[in-house]
């Protein structure tokens, strides 16, 4: 099987939504209740990918996973902070591909001078918590019974990781659209799957 990681295209919206939809309808991993339309999902992709990396994992040309980061909080002092998200189709889970996808995402965020990564995970999603822990994330908090889905209250855990050095005055945040294409290609070209 051939795997490839690349940056998202708006035309990927339907294929990405196909990966995401079961997490909405069948699990408590996503706190959404209703699967968005392809058009709405494409708008989300456009909005996020203008500022932050949004990448997809393909298996023999089929999108089987994706990861992205987005602004964590709006105040200017949070410019170096992001929330990260990853979803993999069940058929590719447990193969180490999530770690590879996240590693690529981290390298792309480093090109933007991002420093602090946060992940919000449903408390009983042990596999995700363990994957994040294996990548250097630390548990920083639990929100008890923060969400209600599928007839039960769910805890949410927050995990965090710092990438790069924290200078006294950090370099400015660079929107993803302004990162040199050659640097993006260099990062993605070095991914071995």
Can you describe what each PLM-predicted range is?
Residues 109-121:
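Conserved GNAT acetyl-CoA-binding A-motif
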Residues 94-107, 130-134:
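Conserved acetyl-CoA-binding loop-helix of GNAT-fold acetyltransferases
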Residues 4-16:
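A short beta-loop-alpha structural element at the N-terminal edge
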Residues 118-121, 133, 138-155, 164-165, ...:
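Conserved catalytic-core motifs of GNAT/GCN5-like acyltransferases
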Residues 17, 21-44:
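Conserved GNAT-fold acetyl-CoA-binding loop/helix
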Residues 36-91, 102-103, 162-163:
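Acetyl-CoA-dependent GNAT
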Residues 62-65, 127, 153:
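Glycine-rich acetyl-CoA-binding "A-motif" of GNAT/NAT acetyltransferases
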Residues 165-193:
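Acidic/histidine-enriched, glycine/proline-rich intrinsically disordered or flexible terminal extensions
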């Amino acid at each position: 099987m051939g795997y490839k990681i690349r940056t998202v295209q708006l035309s990927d919206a339907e294929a990405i939504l196909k990966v995401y939809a079961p997490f909405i309808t069948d699990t408590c991993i996503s706190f959404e209740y209703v699967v968005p339309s392809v058009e709405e999902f494409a708008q989300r992709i456009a909005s996020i990918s203008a500022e932050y990396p949004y990448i997809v994992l393909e298996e023999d040309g089929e999108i089987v996973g994706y990861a992205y980061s987005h602004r964590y909080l709006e105040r200017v002092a949070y410019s170096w902070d992001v929330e990260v998200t990853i979803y993999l189709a069940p058929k590719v889970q447990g193969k180490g591909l999530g770690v590879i996808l996240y590693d690529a995402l981290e390298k792309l965020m480093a090109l933007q001078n991002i420093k602090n990564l946060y992940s919000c995970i449903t408390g009983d999603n042990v596999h995700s918590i363990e994957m994040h822990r294996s990548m250097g994330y630390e548990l920083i908090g639990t929100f008890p019974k923060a969400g209600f889905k599928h007839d039960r209250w769910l805890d949410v855990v927050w995990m965090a990781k710092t990438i790069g050095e924290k200078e006294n005055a950090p370099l400015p945040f660079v929107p993803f659209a302004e990162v040199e294409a050659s640097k993006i290609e260099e990062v993605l070209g070095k991914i071995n799957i």
